[in-house]
């Protein structure tokens, strides 16, 4: 159940909001399947499929965003529209004009939508009301923006802000590669990407390859900067850091997996244990990442 890709946002620490209040905010935006003429739908759904829109334990909340999309290939619409256009041409004795073609396409789309397949995708959101984190489990920035957009619409005056650190992640990652070692409690793994900001964006990627200090220095002296860096925190969690501070490819290592509660009697107890373990470890990881980047900035301060 561990989150894999972490888009981080800040909340007040602590954020004094109850589960009941959160349920009240989300309920008007609960997910409902798209009707016959809609191509997309979004809303909140139960994280545990028990009717509740908010799962909570130890002041850690979990909510789930669901998006539905109808699959209606443009090629199918075009094919049917062309066939209808030929029929119309025979009836009226001349080819349909632009407006007629546009109307035909809209008509065909409306007719085909009820028969279109639909897909639903869920995206999880963790709200740490104690330490003031809001975390979206999404690799795509566009998806994260969609989730955040609905959350802002749902929650009355959501007190959210971006994470602002003293040192830009690109500069920090580049310096760590130059030094050949990570900051305190972090080790460098064997995946990285270096890219030149100059025209052409010359890029070098290392995957499962030792990051030799001489090689790193040569690339950096040539003007390249580190854009992705695989790291491990405290021998407990491995991940990839990015320029936007999105933490990707999060993996709990064996020492954490072994800490999972062996006495759990059912799925609910196991979920409680796993979620508590994940939120506790990741909250400490976030503190470590922020410290490694020089700490958080006050409003109005600029990153180095």
Swiss-Prot record:
The keyword Transcription regulation does not apply. GO terms for molecular function: double-stranded DNA binding. NCBIfam families: PRK00321.1-4, PRK00321.1-5. Keywords: Cytoplasm, DNA recombination. May be involved in recombination. GO terms for cellular component: bacterial nucleoid; cytoplasm. This is Recombination-associated protein RdgC. It is found in: Cytoplasm, Nucleoid. It comes from the Bacteria. Belongs to the RdgC family. The keyword Cytoplasm applies. Pfam families: RdgC. It comes from Paraburkholderia phymatum (strain DSM 17167 / CIP 108236 / LMG 21445 / STM815). InterPro entries: RdgC. GO terms for biological process: DNA recombination; regulation of DNA recombination.
């Amino acid at each position: 159940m561990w989150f894999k890709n972490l888009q981080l946002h800040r909340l007040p620490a602590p954020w004094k909001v109850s589960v009941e209040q959160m349920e009240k905010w989300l309920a008007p935006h609960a997910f409902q399947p798209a009707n016959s003429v809609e191509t997309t739908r979004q809303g909140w759904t139960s994280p545990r499929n028990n009717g509740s829109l908010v799962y909570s334990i130890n002041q850690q909340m979990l909510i789930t965003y669901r998006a539905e999309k109808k699959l209606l290939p443009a090629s199918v619409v075009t094919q049917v529209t062309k066939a209808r256009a030929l029929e119309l041409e025979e009836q009226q004795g001349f080819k349909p004009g632009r407006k007629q073609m546009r109307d035909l396409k809209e008509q065909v789309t409306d007719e085909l939508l009820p028969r279109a397949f639909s897909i639903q995708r869920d995206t999880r959101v963790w709200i740490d009301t104690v330490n003031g984190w809001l975390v979206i489990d999404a690799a795509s920035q566009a998806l994260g923006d969609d989730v955040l957009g609905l959350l802002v619409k749902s929650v009355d005056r959501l007190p959210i802000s971006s994470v602002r650190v003293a040192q830009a992640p690109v500069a920090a990652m580049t310096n760590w590669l130059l030094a050949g070692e990570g900051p305190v409690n972090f080790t460098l793994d064997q995946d990285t990407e270096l890219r030149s900001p100059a025209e052409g964006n010359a890029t070098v990627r290392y995957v499962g390859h030792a990051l030799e200090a001489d090689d790193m220095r040569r690339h950096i002296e040539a003007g390249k900067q580190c854009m992705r860096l695989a790291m491990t925190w405290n021998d407990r969690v491995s991940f990839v850091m990015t320029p936007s501070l999105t933490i990707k490819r999060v993996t709990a290592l064996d020492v954490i997996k072994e800490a999972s509660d062996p006495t759990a009697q059912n799925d609910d107890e196991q979920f409680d244990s796993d979620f508590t373990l994940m939120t506790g470890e990741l909250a400490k990881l976030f503190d470590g990442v922020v410290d490694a980047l020089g700490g958080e900035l006050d409003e109005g301060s600029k990153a180095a």
